[in-house]
C-alpha cells in the first residue's frame, strides 16, 4: 500500500460554524487546503483510503466523522475539548497579540510572538495526536493542520465557552 492511500481526500466542516472574521476564514481555508494536499491519516484497523473527514460539534465535544472515499462510514470519534482548554486560550491570546503587533510592532517583536505561537501549536498538535490515537493515527503536520482547523472552528463560534475562560 502506498502512503497516498492513507490521506484525506475531503474535509467538511459543520456549517453551523459561522463568522465574518476574514482572518479566521483564511486560517480555516488554508488548513483545509494543506490537509488535502498532504496528510497522513490512518484509521486504526482500516486497510486503506483515501478518507473523508467531517468535523462537527455535539454536546460540547468535537466529533470527527471518518468515511472512505465513497462515503461509507468507518468511525466517529468524540473528542472532549477540556484537555485543550489552556492551549486554545493561550493560542487565541497569542494570535490576537500577533495580529495587533502586525500593525504596531517591529519585526523582532513579530518573530518573538510567532515563536511562542509555534510552540503552543506544537504542544497542542502533540496532544491532539495522543487524543486521537485510539481511532486514527496522524503525523505531526496533519495534527498541526487539524489543530489549526479546530482553533478556527471555535474562533468562528466566538461564543464557545472554551475560548471565553
Swiss-Prot record:
Record bears the keyword Iron-sulfur: no
UniProt KW keywords: Plasmid
Keyword Transferase annotated: no
Pfam families linked: UPF0262
Family, as annotated: Belongs to the UPF0262 family.
NCBIfam families: PRK02853.1 (NF002769)
Stated name of the protein: UPF0262 protein y4uD
Species of provenance: Sinorhizobium fredii (strain NBRC 101917 / NGR234)
Amino acid at each position: 500500500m502506498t502512503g497516498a492511500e492513507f490521506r484525506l481526500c475531503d474535509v467538511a466542516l459543520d456549517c453551523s460554524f459561522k463568522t465574518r472574521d476574514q482572518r479566521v476564514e483564511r486560517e480555516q481555508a488554508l488548513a483545509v487546503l494543506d490537509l488535502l494536499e498532504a496528510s497522513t491519516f490512518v484509521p486504526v484497523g482500516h486497510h486503506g483510503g483515501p478518507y473523508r473527514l467531517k468535523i462537527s460539534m455535539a454536546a460540547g465535544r468535537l466529533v470527527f466523522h471518518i468515511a472512505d472515499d465513497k462515503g461509507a462510514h468507518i468511525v466517529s470519534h468524540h473528542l472532549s475539548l477540556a484537555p485543550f482548554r489552556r492551549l486554545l486560550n493561550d493560542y487565541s491570546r497569542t494570535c490576537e497579540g500577533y495580529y495587533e503587533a502586525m500593525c504596531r510592532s517591529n519585526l523582532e517583536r513579530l518573530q518573538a510572538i510567532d515563536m511562542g505561537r509555534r510552540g503552543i501549536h506544537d504542544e497542542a498538535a502533540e496532544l491532539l495526536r495522543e487524543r486521537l490515537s485510539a481511532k486514527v493515527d496522524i503525523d505531526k503536520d496533519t495534527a498541526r493542520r487539524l489543530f489549526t482547523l479546530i482553533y478556527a472552528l471555535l474562533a468562528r463560534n466566538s461564543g464557545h465557552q472554551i475560548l471565553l475562560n
